Every structure is written in C-alpha cells, then in structure tokens.
Amino acid sequence: MEDPIKIIHKYKNNNGRIQYHINIFIGDIVDENCMRILRKIKNLDLYTSLTSLETREIDILEKNYGEYWYEKFFNSYHINNTKELTLKNSVRMRELRSLYTEEWVNRHFVNYKKRLETTIFNYEYVVKEDRERRSVKRHIRRQQDDVEELLDYRTTGHPLPPALNDEQYVMSRIESSVETDNWCADNLLEEQLTESELNRELKKLVSKQNLDYSTDKPEDSESEDIELEDSESEDSESEDIDQHGGQGPDDDEFNANFDDPQFDEFDFGNTEDEQNVKLFEMEVEQDLEDVDLLFNDIDETDKNSKLTTREIKEAISNEQYDRIGKKIVDFDESRDNSMFDENLKDVITKTYITNQYLFKDDTIKTIRDKICCGFKNSNKFGENTYIIPSHQYLWSEYTYQGKIDRVMIGQKWIIRNDILKLDVEPNTNTSVKKNSGEIYVF
C-alpha cells in the first residue's frame, strides 16, 4: 500500500462558496511510526513539512511511499505553487540546501516540472487523430475520383509520343475503356457497351488486314466492303445493347426504379463512409435510449434495512460493529460558513482514510462504494448521511504537454452528440446552466 490515492471532495458551503476536502485512502496496514509522522504533517504545508521533519522521519516516509512521498499527500496545485515560490525566494532555497543535498534540491525543485510531463497522449488526442486520419483518407479518395486527365496537343517543346501500329492502337483503346469503366464494373449496361466496342474494333482490324492483302479487288468494291462491315458492326452493336427509354405502346409516362442495379453509380448512400456514419448514428441513438439504465442496478435499495442491520449485529459483536462505524470519517464542517472560495493550491489539511484503500485496478463501482464507506456527508442533510455511489460524479486530472487535462470517470463516452457535450469539471456558476442551449434540452 505504498501508492495511496487522493480523493478531493469539491462542494459548496452554506454561503455557496467552493470548498475542498482532501481524503487520502492509506488503508489500515500502516505502522505506528509512519502514522505518527503523517499525523504530524496533517495540517502543514509542503515547505514546512520538508523543513520540520527530521532525517529519520524522511527516511521512514521514503521507505513506505518512495522518494517522492509528498506527491501522495499534497495536491499537485499546492506542490507547483510551493516550488515556484521557493525558487523565487533565496532564503528558502538556502535553508533547503542546508538540510538536503544539492542533488536532491535540483531533482525535487529545479527539475521537478520535467518529471510531471510524462503523459505522451490523452483521450482527446486519440479521438482527434482517428477522425483526422479518416478525413484525410476521405479527401484523398475524393481527389482521386475528381482528377481528370489533362490532354496536351502541343507539337513543340516536348517529344511526340511514338506511333502505334494497328494492333497496339486497338489494345490501347481496350485498356483505356477498361480503366475508364473500372469504377462502375458492376453496371450491366456499361459492360455491354465495352464488349460491343471491343467487337467493333476487332472487326475493323480484321477487315482492314483482309483488304490490304486483297490487291485484285477494285477500289469501289473495297469501299463498299468497308461500308458493309461498318453497317454489320453497327447492326451487331444494336443487337447487343439493351435499349432503355422511349414510349411503349401502353406507357403514357416514364417510370424508373432506382433500386435497379444499373443505377448503383448514382446511389451515394451506399458508399462505405455513409454506411459507417449511419451505423454510428444508430449506435448513438441506442446509447441515448440506454443512458438512463446505465447505472440502474448500482444502488439496490434494501427494503428490509433494519432486519439486515440486526442480522449483521448478530454475526459480529456490537462493540466491533460500533468500531467499524467509527472508522468512517465525519464530514469536516469547519469551513461551512466561510465567505471566500477556496483555492486548491492553498488547501493543506489532509484527512486519512484508514478503513479503505483504493487499488489501481478497482472498478468504478468499487471505487464509488469505498468512497461511500470512507467518509460521510454533511449532517445538515440529516443524521449519519452518506454519499450515495450513484450520486457521485468523478473526474481525474493529469498533466499533458505542460497543461492540466481532465477526463471523466465512470461516464459513458458518446461522440458526436450535442446533448451530452458537457464540461468535465462542472461549472460552479449555476446561472450559466439555466436555459442555456443544450443544457436546457438535457
């Protein structure tokens, strides 16, 4: 239990002023010597703690909580503020150098900021990177679809392309038509046109080769044969193509069924991106329908609470039951009548929770339950009131690129939803939430 977690309880007092309670879940496996030192620094700030503790006491804290033990008991705002004020005060720096080595002062004060910048990415960065990657792919795909071949008919300034013989010319025409029609290869009409064009070009090539070797025929018959071949190819082409449109004998108007496969090239709703968007919107709608039932089974009210309490007392002695209840820390009401908002950098009072310990792999439900069993709510809401797990709103703060970033804990992530675009840290000014856009709708 060398890495206790701090739960900072933010609330408003009787005068509507923001106050903070720092609750540190240290657990019950703490030796008496270490506990005595923790009680000594309970109401001390960081600088006073560093200068008032003896070397033996510092060694005990480092043995139990590591070299940076003060991070476990002071919030980051207070640590950064103390560091900045100490670096600017030569008297404080001189006193620290007299108590600690120069290496220790440089590592814990001068270069302390570099140690905080350890996070290489955050949740927002991951989401942004994924959306940018999809946007770039979509943009490249559209550019490829919109690119048109630039035709250059200049005869000077650049070499002319090599001349093609008849066979190469026909093959280039075939390859060109195949590449052009590749994007709609599933279209039956386009396939028929490509096949008919191929037949026509092949017949022209065969007829021309036959005419070149037929020297005994007059020119008139040659031209006549060419015209006949063209007409035959046109007839064959007309036979291969399915004619659409026109007015039938019994049709007074044109009716088109756009569900037909030949109109797939105009069905922009069937693209992969559009299908993904529709699927995502359906999932979001389903999430919105289930959001009220997300934590529905977290707090099951015990209808026979008195009977349950009596059974628990029968299982354990009354003295042990009272001892367990006394371990739950009472709510500190000393600042309920304060007229000023409290700043986290000035909060130094620490409350140690010894009957619970938060592990890094605890589920959100377990964390909520341990908070409920760790400290009580204010008595102004009633006698022996607790912070109900389902009524707890949790968020975490961490340093990313030199700035404080926040992330919700236990809240369902819903992207591209205007209704649930809320502040991670609730705005203390409740007047901005009244009749204000999406908050009013929510």
Curated annotation (Swiss-Prot):
Acidic residues: bias regions: 221-240
Alphabetical UniProt keywords: Virion
Places the protein is found: Virion
GO terms under cellular component: virion component
Primary location recorded for the protein, binned into one broad class: virion
Region of interest: Disordered: 211-269
Source taxon at top rank: Viruses
Protein known as: Uncharacterized protein R326
Organism: Acanthamoeba polyphaga mimivirus (APMV)
